[in-house]
Amino acid sequence: MTSKQYEASSGQRGAVVVHAGENISLKEALEQWTVTELRSLASAYSVKAPSKLRKEPLIDAVASALLERDRMREVLLALEPEDWGLFHRTEEAGTYRPKQSEGGCGLALQRLGYLCRIRDGGKESYTVPEEVRAVYRELAAEGFCTRKERADLIHAYAMAASNLYGVIPQGDLIRIFNTQNGKKITEEELFSVLLRHISLKCGYALWDKYLVNDAFEANDYRDVPDLLKRVGGKPRYIPPKQELLKYADPDYYERTPEASLMRHYLLQDADLEPDLAEGVLSELHFAIVLEAKPVQLLDILRDYEVPLLGDHMQIAVSYTHLTLPTNSRV
């Protein structure tokens, strides 16, 4: 499924099925969808001429496409860890009531028909339709979970490298992975994972022989050569595996003493809300990754209306001149 096809279905969430118990058929779940929603999903699954189908044959066509083994395998392999975890827990438990922290998870799976919401006794839970569960268990019996774990690890390395370095030669990413893991990765295996996630606009992209953060796409990657020139021959900072993988989260930055001082300044002196302060720090960190000049970092602070007068200016300027560990890379 391409990014465009996925987006065609991304506006739909699927209706809630009023149902007691965990056993719900795929047809029963899809019957709650409107014809417009079903046609959108049918288009995403490349069903021929969905606009000409009425609801019942449309449901049959969508269900048939949704249950294709190869398609289900690719969809599940492309899931981000949070969505995959939700699917796996729900499939194992039969029904699963999401925690408050999981409120944003599961939407992609609902939109694609692999997960549905049920209401039983006034409370909503998730369940996996019976036919979907049956096909998934066939995949699991063939070792799918091991393959998924491996693919997610490779994806996490790609996310971490693109967030930490901004741009990295693909060969260097392979060397870092192979240095930190017992089972080595090949170029072919790397590309199969990268292309699957890039098609869904995951956060990184391929440019020439480099893996780059997809933020460069905004100006058609014209800043990539400039960044490569500025980092020159600097030795790359490579954190230990567990620290490196923290950078798979695009909002993560290393809590250096300097970063802690800046966070304290934003919270106490600039009086920013905690979430906003973290957002400012994340943006500053990424700008540092891209070798931004101190004046550009100060511009970020001005954009957030952070006071830059007197002692405040001195603190901000001191921070923007600091060389963080992540500022040394090739």
For each feature predicted by the language model, list its residue ranges:
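Charge-enriched amphipathic alpha-helical scaffolds
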Residues: 105-114, 182-208
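A short acidic, leucine-rich amphipathic alpha-helix
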Residues: 101, 172-174
